[in-house]
Amino acid sequence: MVSRQEQFEQVQAVKKSINTASEEVKNQALLAMADHLVAATEEILAANALDMAAAKGKISDVMLDRLYLDADRIEAMARGIREVVALPDPIGEVLETSQLENGLVITKKRVAMGVIGIIYESRPNVTSDAAALTLKSGNAVVLRSGKDAYQTTHAIVTALKKGLETTTIHPNVIQLVEDTSRESSYAMMKAKGYLDLLIPRGGAGLINAVVENAIVPVIETGTGIVHVYVDKDADEDKALSIINNAKTSRPSVCNAMEVLLVHENKAASFLPRLEQVLVAERKEAGLEPIQFRLDSKASQFVSGQAAETQDFDTEFLDYVLAVKVVSSLEEAVAHIESHSTHHSDAIVTENAEAAAYFTDQVDSAAVYVNASTRFTDGGQFGLGCEMGISTQKLHARGPMGLKELTSYKYVVAGDGQIRE
């Protein structure tokens, strides 16, 4: 096993091969990575079978689905890499140019961060997404996967590095930390001088640990306590469709809905219809029904478990939905601001004034009007695959694409000027 220190030194030694690579060279490298990923399908699936067998019975079925790979999912990962090839290279972009009275010309240019560390949990597709985005944005990357997905991640990284071996980019610009202990995560948090940026992708425990302990710069990819508010002026059919999609299409992801707020004027008519769609119809179709966690008012209209206080502060990542009836738009917004993780929140309404109030007052990275929160995604936003969803305000916010993985520098051109 290569030590963490050796890996940090290896990536530092070769980072310039990607930091200063041309767009053509980077694109050739990405295409080779995608081709080798597909070519290694058999090996990746064998590794994934080991991870799945080890995880079965230890994690939920929803989490098992996040871990699971098949040939179609591997092809989708390769397609994601190829989509990054089609995106414009951000490196070298001139952001601003100005000329001072003394003749100095100051140009603000976009540059690579350098080396980016990613700590993430059991999601194999993050491996290929992270590698593609970091390399296209001119960065080397150090990956630290969750233990549950290590065999799969190792097979994916092996394929990606074999692709790089056919190009002029050194394969060591992608590093996978072999030690899956907690100590390896903390070592990355303390790797000042080796990592220029650290991005955690996972649950609240992981993200909080990184934010609280890291001495390297961090972009916080927050958990998603995502709300949908059904206003008194909502179109109920529209609301049913949006909620069904936001909650059931993929409940294990961070942009999935976790909390429903319903105006009291809508509760009696809307909640029974919602129960029919999310519970009865799903049972009839052989699908897992949604379990409701209901406040006292909501429980008057539908069946479910009484909500505990913590249910409105929980990212369930499962077929569970907390439901609260509110007396006004203002109460809905106040609840969201008290409980939201500032990821994605939505209002369903036909009232333009209510929509404007909601979008002005809700301080989240993505605020929706009459649309599913599942659109908070780099691909859906036209950014290609994403590095994560930032819930902080400094440097990056919302889906992080190529530009969010860069910095800038000032190039100052003169003709012998000196400061008086």
UniProtKB/Swiss-Prot annotation:
One GO cellular component assignment for this chain's record is: cytoplasm
| Function according to Swiss-Prot or TrEMBL | Catalyzes the NADPH-dependent reduction of L-glutamate 5-phosphate into L-glutamate 5-semialdehyde and phosphate. The product spontaneously undergoes cyclization to form 1-pyrroline-5-carboxylate.
HAMAP family according to UniProt: ProA
Write down the chemical reaction(s) this protein catalyses.
L-glutamate 5-semialdehyde + phosphate + NADP(+) = L-glutamyl 5-phosphate + NADPH + H(+)
Q: Name one process (GO BP) from the record.
A: L-proline biosynthetic process
Q: Which key words tag this protein in UniProt?
A: Amino-acid biosynthesis, Cytoplasm, NADP, Oxidoreductase, Proline biosynthesis
Q: In which pathway does it act?
A: Amino-acid biosynthesis; L-proline biosynthesis; L-glutamate 5-semialdehyde from L-glutamate: step 2/2
Could you tell me where this protein is found in the cell?
Cytoplasm
Q: What is its EC number?
A: 1.2.1.41
Family, per entry: Belongs to the gamma-glutamyl phosphate reductase family.
What Gene3D superfamilies does the entry give? Answer: Aldehyde Dehydrogenase, Chain A, domain 1, Aldehyde Dehydrogenase, Chain A, domain 2
**Natural source organism:** Streptococcus pneumoniae serotype 4 (strain ATCC BAA-334 / TIGR4)
Q: Does the keyword NADP apply?
A: yes
Q: Enumerate the InterPro entries for this protein.
A: Ald_DH/histidinol_DH, Ald_DH_C, Ald_DH_N, Aldehyde_DH_dom, G-glutamylP_reductase_CS, Glu-5-SA_DH, GPR_dom
List the protein's name. Gamma-glutamyl phosphate reductase
UniProt keyword Oxidoreductase, yes or no: yes
Molecular function (GO) terms listed? glutamate-5-semialdehyde dehydrogenase activity; NADP binding
Give the first-level EC class, as a single word.
oxidoreductase
